[in-house]
Amino acid sequence: MRLSKSQGILPLAHAVLAAAIAYSTAATAADYRLEAEDFTNVGGTYNDGQPQKISVYTVNGITAINYVNKGDYAEYTLSVPQAGQYDLTYFAGTAIDGARIDFQVNNNGSWQTLARTDVPNAGWDNFQPLPAGSIHLSSGSQQIRLFGGGDHDWQWNLDKMELAYIDDSSSSSGGGSTSSSSSGGSSSSSGSGSSSSGGSPEEGGHVSGTFKLEAESAHHVGGEIDTYAINGGVAVNYFNSGDYLEYNLHLDQSGLYRPKYYVSTAHSSGVAVGLMATDHEGALVTKNTSEVQSQGGWDSFYLLNAASDINLFSGDLTIRIYGAGTQDFQFNIDYVIFERISDVDLDLDGDSDGIADVNDSCPGTDPSETANSEGCAPSQLDTDKDGIADNRDQCPTTAPGDFVDSEGCASTGADDDDLDGIANQEDQCPDTPFGENVAPSGCTGFEDSDSDGIANGTDQCPSTPAKEFTNESGCSPSQVANPHSVKVTVNANIKHSVKGISDFGRNRHITAHTTIYEKDWEGHADKLNYLVNTLDVTLGRDNGTATWKFQDTKEDPNRENWPDLDYMVTRGKELRENYEANPFYKRFSADRTELIAGTNPHPTYPTLSWNANGSTWHDWQPMHIETSAAWMGQYLKHYYANSSNGYIGDPMPKFWEVINEPDMEMKTGKFMVTNQEAIWEYHNLVAQEIRSKLGNEAPLIGGMTWGQHDFYRRDGISRYADNAYDQWIVADDPAEEAAAEEFFRQAMATTVDDTRDQNWYQWDVMWKGFMDAAGHNMDFYSVHVYDWPGVNSDAKSTLRRNGHLPAMLDMIEWYDVYQNGQANRKPIVISEYGAVQGGWNTLAHQPRFESEVLKSFNAMLMQILERPDYVIKSMPFTPAKPLWGYYPGGCGYEEVRNCTAPYHYSLLIEPVLNSDNWQWSDYIKFYELWADIDGTRVDSVSSDPDVQVQSYVNNNELFIIINNLETVDTTIDLTVAGLNNAQLQNVELRNMHFDNNFDTQLERHHMKQMPTKVTLAADATLVLRYTLNSTIAINQSVDEKKYFGNSVSGGSVPHRISVAGGAKNLQVNNVSVPSGYAESQLRLTVALYPSQDDTPDSLLQIDTLTINGHTIETPIDWRGRKENSVERYFNTLEIPVPVDVLQKNNTISVDFRHNGELTVANLVIKEYTTTPVRH
């Protein structure tokens, strides 16, 4: 099997081929024939009741062996007159799936697998010729073993095998069993015997004296490499910087060794071979790096002596050879020889730092540095244990417990230490007490004639009336002609509850999409401390850890493409203990690190990608969703703290999302070969595996984190046809090619995608389909939602922060309740929200790229807070330092970065790209704006749906948050009631707005009297913090209840109707109508043809609405800005309804002005224990 390189596609992974290929039945001319019954020995492990592990029988005049079970084997002695390549053919039969023959050779006492061959299910006695590829055999007497290597208990019957001599070099395929291997897995068993020397020792094999390791026979591989035939043998190419080959051996006797590499390169500089090996204490350490010089090109090999001799110690020995130079492409390598020179030299000093290796605490010291008596140089030490190496530490005696900056000096990590609105670098008075207004210098005591907090020298409105907050120019609402005015009323004594939930939920919603253990925070401990401990932000979310730990998982030695579950126990313990031993992590409380975790599609999910991202570092990949689900259960049990391991290590995630945004990669150029049904079933399997492993200690499990969130639209992503991969699959045997093509087609095939190009696909299939198939196994539904600002301006923005997000949530909630009842409703986790724009990816960073995101953060959070019972966790998308997203791809991790564009969505940015000078982005202002807000939600209302308001009381403080969804400055007429006898001491105003250059401004002002007016700028957010002299008494309540309407279609799927053609009748039943004061609202979730909002002649209006025969006046202004750039106007229309028209069972008639669809009709009633103040 091969793939056409002219199409730029890497060779297909052996693991993928295994599931795809049915082998040719063409006969092979035999030079040697070995009858199966002529074995010299048999063995095995499976007890099948026979006298011995393998039996002999006769059928159709043929004598053959049978009762070969998994783990059984037959051994033969073969006299090979001439070394060379041989084509191997079996005459075997089986009646089951999952049978495989492993061809093994005894190599110095160790059995080495040269070929693995799947046996097709064609009948036990149907002995058709089965080509098994080519193998290399040495001359002389050879011990051969045929091993039952498949995953079924029963394996195969065998008549005979034939060997046909090819020549004395490797085959045209590059050697080994490339065309017949089914593992593609760890390279210890993927045709490694094809090298010119007959191969390397198998994993764990014994070596002594001088020994040779073939490059293509590495037991484990890191990175993305390939093999090719050259000079009568096989070598490794595509060896990049950081790639490695690893061998796990057992050395019989210690000794001093001289490594020699047979290598080539076409580069004149920047190429080096790095060598790591286990030391006398069993630790894997760097031994040396050796520069590789070009001898004329990639195929001009030469023998390179390593830069120094090394000691190798007896016992278990790991050797790792890696690309250590600066060039992306490093070298090709054929083999390495370890020449034993003498016994161990205990005086050997491999890094030439003056300390013998056996006494050297820091091997690999840079020659340019001077080591201490323990062999450690400043770059290898951190004397004050502040996380900054001594050679970079400008404050080398930091006190224990201090958080430090990138130079090792104690720092708060803040950009405005005294929170006076003046950045540290501009603040001439850095310790201003809270409650004081400051001048632009950051100092108090300035002249301010009208006491508005704006210095006379910059005050453009010098006679501001009392009780009015001003804007940045010193002008209050009554001094400027704001085009719009809105009344906001707060009743601080009335608790607002939804299904019993009334708290702000700071740890649920003031969160950041990062973790304390990310390398992004190395050198920025002060900033992490500021974010988490000072601003009281809860972390985080993590998909990357599971990704690399899956890549790190070894293959089960007895089951191809299956994780080694025993290895996971050991490896998990090692990593948990590493976490437990890190004192830095203990400086952050557990309630500040409540984790949402999960996995990315590659390589955890069986994407079948033949690119490097589809496989593990050990060169195996999952082929079935059952494999990945089994790994997931084992991973959570053994890699996280729980009762089974004494609660040692990483805290168990609170939430587990099964897979992150698979729709963005499924059937696209990102190479994810799968279908909707498989992903749904995968969620079921993962949930079952995790719960079976952890029981009631399992995290809450959820999905589907779709990347698309326009329920009314068709699929927004172009996808490959089911036969798309045919063009890249090429085989010499037409049968092989056809089988491989069919395998990929079946993996892509689906029964639910006929409507991909039709409206409502994203709901009918992607969301509803998932809920129907896997909802019963989910603890929560996981949602992502983003605005898409225009590339160059706001004119072409597609916004979901209007009524779009409420519409999404109402549809999910209604259908869940309709199917399962209110008692079984699943909550929502919004694990990503914000704004993104693909058109920015290659552009230089601009302030607007941050301000547009902040608008979305604030508006979406305000909507999330309206549903405290339903959205149990939310998280803005705020990666810390996402070098993985820098452009062009991969540049962020180069030794010398030369990126042309950053990833624009991050907490930390470089003002100058590639400078490594990391500063807070404006994202930190989001957390500064929301700092300290906590407490009990209290009654607050706005007279305009485009002005959002939420209010919370926390002891003696009242927080009022107001956000503007519109693009015009608005006067807020503010009324605060219910403070009883508490006396005001201070009101702090935090004002986040955006100037004409799109810079984000966060200003702070203070007032000692109750404000009555304040300007809310376009897209701005205000926080008013009232401090009183005593606790605010919350002595009344309002209870909000939602009553779910009947199916708008009368119960017929898909539960939506066209609104064209006259009035539509709806029903909301079983309503408990309050007898006291109450307020109610009809909520209609619609997708209408777009039109301008908030105008009498808008196509978005309702012509008539009646409830139980009563005509209801409907608004002309819906939630969200007047101008919108959307394909459909997707919104939940919120219509005030007099409570006295409601009954237990309510008949609703609604006639829309124009066309579209209606999906959900609900009633919301707020029942008060007292009559609230209304402005």
From Swiss-Prot:
Residue ranges constituting the CBM6 domain according to the UniProt record: 32-164, 211-339
PROSITE patterns referenced in this protein's UniProt entry, alphabetically: CBM6 (PS51175)
Catalytic center residues: 661, 832
GO BP, sorted A to Z: cell adhesion
Cysteines paired by S-S bonds: none
Regulation: Activity and stability are strongly enhanced by CaCl(2). Activity is not affected by sulfhydryl inhibitors such as iodoacetoamide and p-chloromercuribenzoate or by thiol reagents such as dithiothreitol and 2-mercaptoethanol. Strongly inhibited by N-bromosuccinimide and sodium dodecyl sulfate.
Stored InterPro entries: BPA_C, CBM6, Cellulose-bd_IV, Galactose-bd-like_sf, Glycoside_hydrolase_SF, Porphyrn_b-sand_dom_1, Thrombospondin_3-like_rpt, TSP_type-3_rpt
Enzyme Commission code: 3.2.1.81
pH dependence: Optimum pH is 7.5.
Keyword line: Glycosidase, Hydrolase, Repeat, Signal
Temperature dependence: Optimum temperature is 45 degrees Celsius.
Entry keyword annotation includes Metal-binding: no
Catalytic activity: Hydrolysis of (1->4)-beta-D-galactosidic linkages in agarose, giving the tetramer as the predominant product
GO molecular function terms listed in the Swiss-Prot or TrEMBL record: calcium ion binding; carbohydrate binding; hydrolase activity, acting on glycosyl bonds
SUPFAM superfamilies (alphabetical): (Trans)glycosidases (SSF51445), Galactose-binding domain-like (SSF49785), TSP type-3 repeat (SSF103647)
Transmembrane segments: none
Extent of Low complexity compositional bias: 178-200
Region of interest called Disordered, as start-end residue ranges on this chain: 169-208, 355-481
Biased composition (Basic and acidic residues): 382-393
Compositional bias annotation for Polar residues: 471-481
Signal peptide annotation: 1-29
Annotated function: Endo-type beta-agarase, which degrades agarose and agarose oligosaccharides more polymerized than hexamers to yield neoagarohexaose (NA6) as the main product, with lesser amounts of neoagarotetraose (NA4) and neoagarobiose (NA2).
Additional observations: Recombinant agarase was produced extracellularly using B.subtilis as a host. The amino acid sequence of the recombinant enzyme expressed in B.subtilis starts with amino acid Gln-479 and ends with His-1175, probably due to proteolytic cleavage.
Family, as annotated: Belongs to the glycosyl hydrolase 86 family.
The name this protein goes by in its record: Beta-agarase AgaO
Gene coding for it: agaO
